[in-house]
Amino acid sequence: MRPWLRMLFVSLLAFLVLAGSLAYAQEVGRIAGTVTAKRDGSPLSFANVLVMGTGLGTFVKDNGGFAIEGVPVGTYTVKVMMMGYAAETKENVVVRANSTTELAIQLSETVVVELPVTQVTAEKPIIDADKTGSRRDIDMEDTAVRSINTVEEAIAAQAGVVLEGGEIHIRGGRSGEVKQFVDGIQISDAFVGNTGLEVSLSSLSEIEVLSGGFDAEYGNVQSGIINLKTREGGPKYSGVVKYMTDDYGSPDKTYFNFDNLSLGFGGPLISRNLRFFASAEVVFSDTYLKTLEPRPQKELWGFIKFRERQTNNYSLQGKATYLFSGMKKLAVEFLGSGDKFDFYHHAFSRVGYWSDIEKHWWFEPLDSTYSLYYGPAHTPNVENNHNSIKMVWNHTLSPSTFYTMRLGRYSTLHEEVVLNKRPDEYVTPSANDRLDPENRFYVVAGDYPHWQHYESVMWTGKGDMTIQRNTTHQIKFGLETNIYQLDMTDMLYPDIDNPTGIYTDIYNFNCWQLSSFLQDRITFEGMNVRAGLRFDLFDPGRKAVESYNRYLLLTGFPGEDAGFFKRTEWQVSPRLGVSYPISERDALYFNYGRFYQIPRLEVMFQFLGQTDQGLLPFGNPLMDAETTIMYEVGVQHQFTGTLVGDVAMFYKDIFGLTGTLPGDLVEGSPFQELYGPTATPVVYTNLDYGSVRGIEFKLTKRFSRRFSGSVTYTFSKATGSSSNELQGSNVVGGGLDRAPITELPLDWDRNHVISTNLYISEPGLWGCNIDWSYSTGRPFTPVLPREREVRAALINSERLDARSTVNIKADKRWRIGGQEVSLFMEGRNVLDRRNIANLTPGSWPGGEGNYSSYYTTEKKLGGAYDEGELLGLPEVIYVPLNDPRVYSTPRNFRVGISFDW
């Protein structure tokens, strides 16, 4: 497209969106339904429908239908009144984000005397005829009775979700393809592509997981949306206190020194229109990977003494809302979380004595030249702090029109430092397999050679307007802009002789993103159609492109034009979803969409601040957006009043994923002069591709007759050209013989995943929950003895053993002073299953040359080094290292108490 046409298109689209209002209607829903006479079913036009406590309401139309737009997410009482009929109220009407709650109300006629108001308790329809894609609404009451203590654990229990190495994959996509929002503001770090901010379950009222059929309002995401709705203060004071620990009785192998305390409290403040809710949570644990690192005692407030543990996490939340009237509402919220931990590294696990003169390590000092060396203390202390502050304004202009405006700031501060040292205070670690032959693999002197500090800030402004034009069309349009500020300092091998280290990466860049959408929800004859169009524009910034030009000049090519219309990337995304109720017990849905996502900013800007990065990959700010085309069809069926099934089939075509590729080079270029005539540069580019297909099944039994439960099953195949964006770099570096020429199973591909949940309870007295999850093994690449180069044909050609976990939770409840107190016990992995987490956890910067997996030939885990090769012998002599990181968390029991009021 010509530059002037592109500018005209962007300007017109922005003007059309700004002509309305701004945002993202995500924390509001809709109440709709019919009001008829109980006697003959005739429509009762002009009946008055009110949502109590909100000031929202409407009149019934001639056909008996009504719709109330812009109802904040929550639980309400709906009252219906009409002259000549007894008023009726429906209690516990649940309104969910971006969804319609259907009500069918019948009024009885009055004759002479006035009848009392009839009260009816509403239940959420077991069939969601409004949904056009896969959506999982996670009930917070459900998580409270299960062995679920974090948002991540709640999401991992859903169909189509795989939790691998602490990263969430939805329907076979890469982990960075999942975005998380709190009340419509993104809390995913665009720099590294993950979700850093931890939100306590005690602060949440709702979790929504979208894995297919996203509306046009969702952009810059390919695989999944996680919507979190935080609690608001109610008209009365309420709160929760929960404490959990595994410190009971004598410590044994199931003891991880775990403590978890969470608090929440809210209610009216000064006036009934001003309300608040605040929560806090702390979690401390030494984990099952206990290190011997000494930790000094600290003091809090002058009298509380404690020691930090291997992992230390906290989260804070504070939210204030003011209801100006039933039509206007302002919410201001702060969210913060942090974690400080020392990761376990097997090569640094030795504690003993080192002699720099003798070049020898031993368990005790052999003479005066030996000094104490705590290996675990010389791994980095990693500290992350995440903060989000936002302001949300909701305004209902009429029963059919409302808008929402949001302004937010999200920041991440990350530090990775050994013993709080400056880079010039680092000591280069021992090259262990050469420095001390008696201690192969283990580091016995020096520091982990990595020093890192980065900060990323994202400013967000967004808004939308929703208009119910008539009973058929609901129009929604909006605009969003994000501004990113990035500051990175990353050093490898810094020390007193070279304070800046090698491969140093230092930069400061700003970039921004603009998006808008228009969608129409069409309802007619029971059918719902969601059709939308989205526009996204990304500008990496002139500074980044000019820095990238230094790389091009280094390789002998002219630089790129850094002008606005040359450096910006834009896309238009169509979305379509259809739902059709076949009967009162069946509903069919289908959706199609194109989803674009800019690569994470880390790979766009890496090493653009300087040109001395060696042969590591250059960032590329001119990369295109990654693309996913998704199709889905599903059906819901209600078997009984409490039993419902949901089946969905999906297919994803993925291309333009981030990968690495040997860069072009002009003969005699400055790059060859700097690194040698055979050196090859590596650059990030849109190289990788893949596909995912699968079927999901969920059977849910609502609570009745003292039990509830669910069964989910997912069959999927996730294949692609690469699981690792650095695969091309490995080819250049000699770690891989060639790039694969066909799609291969991805690292997180688990073909069969089953999850079951059974809850048995006597309400108000006791309860017991059992969770069982099972998945077939993930793929792995066979490693053959003394082969330094992996064969592309063998990548992920075999599979590990299946993974299985059983968790239980049992509680006993009492009513004390009218409030509920619960004592509970939680068992995790109660069968102590040894599930494989990793065949060969990283050993860098140790002697990796002789360290590898010997699972392929010996079927043993934990990694080993080949003593025969080190001694120059022809036979292979494996010396096992028994790295505990190869297994996931073993059995652990916890006890706790909670108090709700």
State where each predicted segment sits.
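Periplasm-facing N-terminal accessory domains of Gram-negative outer-membrane beta-barrel systems
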Residues: 23-121, 125-126, 162
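Periplasmic N-terminal accessory/gating domains of Gram-negative outer-membrane beta-barrel systems
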Residues: 86, 94-103, 116-216, 220-225, ...
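Gram-negative outer-membrane beta-barrel transporters
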Residues: 242, 650-653, 670-782
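Transmembrane beta-barrel wall of Gram-negative outer-membrane proteins
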Residues: 255-345, 381-403, 574
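Solvent-exposed loop segments that connect transmembrane elements
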Residues: 289-307, 344-379, 419-449, 493-504, ...
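Signature of Gram-negative outer-membrane beta-barrel scaffolds
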Residues: 303, 448-452, 457-460, 468, ...
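Membrane-embedded beta-barrel scaffold of Gram-negative outer-membrane proteins
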Residues: 404, 408, 587-589, 593, ...
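C-terminal beta-signal and adjacent terminal beta-strands/loops
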Residues: 765-769, 773-787, 812-901
